[in-house]
């Protein structure tokens, strides 16, 4: 439906607790607002169409299979619960690490977020430059790391190291 609204524009004096009446010839601006009601299914379909509109048929099929492949996995990653699975699946890039390979380094800036699909990662930390790294935890499938450095633009706090970590 269409609604009209009026907006009176005037300067106010320093006394905010008093409301003065509009001036005899106020400046009037008219505007209109309209909206259509959509169901959640309509909105999801629209988003899907927008996301897939630039893809050819083969790319659409590949994207659909990628989404199905990751859908169950992504539902187990709590930090992604509120996000659209299609958008998240589209943003994922599989990577593979060798056994013992450093994934991130403590103290370095972080610009990536990792979700473990398969395998485990040892979380290593050292308290000072003179100390050795100590394992303080292990991460496995559906665990994630790197979100704090990425979201807060801070150096990495811990440094996971792969232990047969595969995509």
Curated annotation (Swiss-Prot):
<comment type="subunit">
    <text>The inactive holoenzyme is composed of two regulatory chains and two catalytic chains. Activation by cAMP releases the two active catalytic monomers and the regulatory dimer. Interacts with PRKACA and PRKACB. PRKAR1A also interacts with RFC2; the complex may be involved in cell survival. Interacts with AKAP4. Interacts with RARA; the interaction occurs in the presence of cAMP or FSH and regulates RARA transcriptional activity. Interacts with the phosphorylated form of PJA2. Interacts with CBFA2T3. Interacts with PRKX; regulates this cAMP-dependent protein kinase.</text>
</comment>
<feature type="short sequence motif" description="Pseudophosphorylation motif">
    <location>
        <begin position="30"/>
        <end position="33"/>
    </location>
</feature>
<dbReference type="InterPro" id="IPR050503">
    <property type="entry name" value="cAMP-dep_PK_reg_su-like"/>
</dbReference>
<dbReference type="GO" id="GO:0030552">
    <property type="term" value="F:cAMP binding"/>
</dbReference>
<dbReference type="GO" id="GO:0004862">
    <property type="term" value="F:cAMP-dependent protein kinase inhibitor activity"/>
</dbReference>
<dbReference type="GO" id="GO:0005952">
    <property type="term" value="C:cAMP-dependent protein kinase complex"/>
</dbReference>
<feature type="binding site">
    <location>
        <begin position="51"/>
        <end position="78"/>
    </location>
    <ligand>
        <name>3',5'-cyclic AMP 1</name>
    </ligand>
</feature>
<keyword id="KW-0547">Nucleotide-binding</keyword>
<keyword id="KW-0114">cAMP</keyword>
<feature type="binding site">
    <location>
        <position position="147"/>
    </location>
    <ligand>
        <name>3',5'-cyclic AMP 2</name>
    </ligand>
</feature>
<dbReference type="GO" id="GO:0005829">
    <property type="term" value="C:cytosol"/>
</dbReference>
<keyword id="KW-0472">Membrane</keyword>
<feature type="binding site">
    <location>
        <begin position="79"/>
        <end position="167"/>
    </location>
    <ligand>
        <name>3',5'-cyclic AMP 2</name>
    </ligand>
</feature>
<comment type="function">
    <text>Regulatory subunit of the cAMP-dependent protein kinases involved in cAMP signaling in cells.</text>
</comment>
<keyword id="KW-1015">Disulfide bond</keyword>
<keyword id="KW-1003">Cell membrane</keyword>
<feature type="binding site">
    <location>
        <position position="156"/>
    </location>
    <ligand>
        <name>3',5'-cyclic AMP 2</name>
    </ligand>
</feature>
<feature type="modified residue" description="Phosphoserine">
    <location>
        <position position="20"/>
    </location>
</feature>
<dbReference type="InterPro" id="IPR018490">
    <property type="entry name" value="cNMP-bd_dom_sf"/>
</dbReference>
<dbReference type="GO" id="GO:0005886">
    <property type="term" value="C:plasma membrane"/>
</dbReference>
<dbReference type="GO" id="GO:0034236">
    <property type="term" value="F:protein kinase A catalytic subunit binding"/>
</dbReference>
<dbReference type="InterPro" id="IPR018488">
    <property type="entry name" value="cNMP-bd_CS"/>
</dbReference>
<keyword id="KW-0677">Repeat</keyword>
<keyword id="KW-0116">cAMP-binding</keyword>
<dbReference type="Pfam" id="PF00027">
    <property type="entry name" value="cNMP_binding"/>
</dbReference>
<feature type="modified residue" description="Phosphoserine">
    <location>
        <position position="34"/>
    </location>
</feature>
<dbReference type="InterPro" id="IPR000595">
    <property type="entry name" value="cNMP-bd_dom"/>
</dbReference>
<feature type="modified residue" description="Phosphoserine">
    <location>
        <position position="82"/>
    </location>
</feature>
<feature type="modified residue" description="Phosphoserine">
    <location>
        <position position="14"/>
    </location>
</feature>
<comment type="similarity">
    <text>Belongs to the cAMP-dependent kinase regulatory chain family.</text>
</comment>
<protein>
    <recommendedName>
        <fullName>cAMP-dependent protein kinase type I-alpha regulatory subunit</fullName>
    </recommendedName>
</protein>
<keyword id="KW-0597">Phosphoprotein</keyword>
<dbReference type="InterPro" id="IPR014710">
    <property type="entry name" value="RmlC-like_jellyroll"/>
</dbReference>
<feature type="modified residue" description="Phosphothreonine">
    <location>
        <position position="12"/>
    </location>
</feature>
